[in-house]
């Protein structure tokens, strides 16, 4: 089975291209998006529509509530799940589509397997993490090297450190040393969907306007009411600026250009990351990218 990763900046059209390819190749899609994995964050994430999700099986969408943590390990697990489902269904290809190249990098490099916790340990840890500063101090006594690389507010890594210690009896640093990551054992072709800069900026602005017309402000109000502003997802582009508007820090007229500017800055960082991290990546416009992937499947 062939595995293709299609990366691209926000608003580049990668999701639409991925859907078109998935329909053509009759394959599944693993979404590599840090927001689409959350339920209820529909407008801010610009996730595929309900109809599109029904037409093509997706992995990595609507799995978590906004107050649950997401991390690279979860996407590595989702990749294995999508790969197994594709093999069982006799698919010829699997598409990985999204803007978060960091998740793809972790899938390729592999992750150290995290030990499992029994229910009582999970409950104990949940209570401990209610006071992150104290949880950090206690973990610091166990592994000062590990905690020197994180902060008390880094809930994802703080939780992972405790899970490793409780599940294995080893300090996180020693666990990582004795349980090295297992690299991806599958052939993977990586593409980046390219667009002329001014066209991308125009699309970003248009998408931002569409998000606001579709009810972004109401969505953010509901999310804040249910989950507060504490979860990491609530600090994402689109949500953070809307909260600033609700606080009276910016006007409604300033909201669209501010979200657009931050999205464009993110797009630039995404492109830079992809160029530096994936040496074999191919940069193609949509028609050529579509044609090349289809040709690869046809000749196999």
UniProtKB/Swiss-Prot annotation:
Residues that, per the record, bind ATP: 8-15
GO biological process terms on file: tRNA modification
Enzyme class of the recorded protein, top EC level: transferase
Catalysed reactions, semicolon-separated: adenosine(37) in tRNA + dimethylallyl diphosphate = N(6)-dimethylallyladenosine(37) in tRNA + diphosphate
Residues at which substrate binds: 10-15
SUPFAM superfamilies per UniProt: P-loop containing nucleoside triphosphate hydrolases
Cofactor: Mg(2+)
Region (Interaction with substrate tRNA): 33-36
Molecular function per GO: ATP binding; tRNA dimethylallyltransferase activity
Site features described as Interaction with substrate tRNA, chain residue numbers: 100
Keyword line: ATP-binding, Magnesium, Nucleotide-binding, Transferase, tRNA processing
Source species, domain of life: Bacteria
Keyword Protease in record: no
Database matches in Pfam families: IPPT
Annotated InterPro entries: Dimethylallyltransferase (IPR039657), IPT (IPR018022), P-loop_NTPase (IPR027417)
EC number from the UniProt entry: 2.5.1.75
Its biological purpose: Catalyzes the transfer of a dimethylallyl group onto the adenine at position 37 in tRNAs that read codons beginning with uridine, leading to the formation of N6-(dimethylallyl)adenosine (i(6)A).
Quaternary structure (record): Monomer.
Family assignment from sequence similarity: Belongs to the IPP transferase family.
Name of the protein in question: tRNA dimethylallyltransferase
Organism (species): Wolinella succinogenes (strain ATCC 29543 / DSM 1740 / CCUG 13145 / JCM 31913 / LMG 7466 / NCTC 11488 / FDC 602W)
């Amino acid at each position: 089975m062939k595995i293709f990763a299609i990366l691209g900046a926000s608003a580049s059209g990668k999701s639409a291209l991925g859907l078109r390819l998935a329909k053509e190749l009759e394959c599944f899609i693993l979404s590599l998006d840090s927001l689409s994995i959350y339920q209820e964050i529909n407008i801010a994430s610009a996730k595929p529509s309900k109809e599109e999700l029904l037409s093509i099986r997706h992995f990595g969408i609507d799995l978590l509530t906004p107050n649950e943590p997401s991390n690279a390990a979860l996407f590595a697990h989702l990749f294995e799940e999508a790969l197994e489902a594709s093999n069982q269904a006799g698919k010829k290809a699997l598409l990985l589509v999204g803007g978060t190249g960091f998740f793809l990098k972790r899938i390729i490099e592999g992750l150290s397997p995290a030990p499992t916790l029994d229910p009582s340990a999970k409950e104990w840890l949940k209570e401990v993490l209610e006071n992150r500063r104290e949880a950090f101090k206690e973990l610091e006594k166990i592994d000062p090297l590990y905690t020197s690389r994180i902060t008390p507010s880094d809930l994802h890594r703080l939780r992972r450190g405790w899970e490793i210690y409780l599940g294995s009896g080893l300090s996180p640093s020693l666990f990582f040393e004795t349980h090295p990551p297992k690299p991806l054992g599958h052939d993977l072709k990586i593409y980046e969907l390219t667009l002329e800069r001014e066209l991308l900026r125009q699309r970003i602005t248009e998408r931002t306007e569409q998000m606001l017309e579709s009810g972004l402000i109401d969505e953010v109000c509901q999310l804040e009411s249910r989950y507060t502003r504490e979860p990491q997802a609530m600090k994402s582009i689109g949500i953070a600026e809307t909260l600033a508007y609700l606080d009276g820090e910016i006007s409604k007229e300033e909201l669209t250009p501010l979200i657009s500017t931050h999205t464009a800055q993110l797009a630039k960082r995404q492109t830079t990351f992809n160029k530096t991290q994936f040496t074999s990546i191919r940069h193609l416009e949509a028609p050529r990218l579509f044609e090349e992937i289809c040709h690869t499947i046809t000749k196999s």
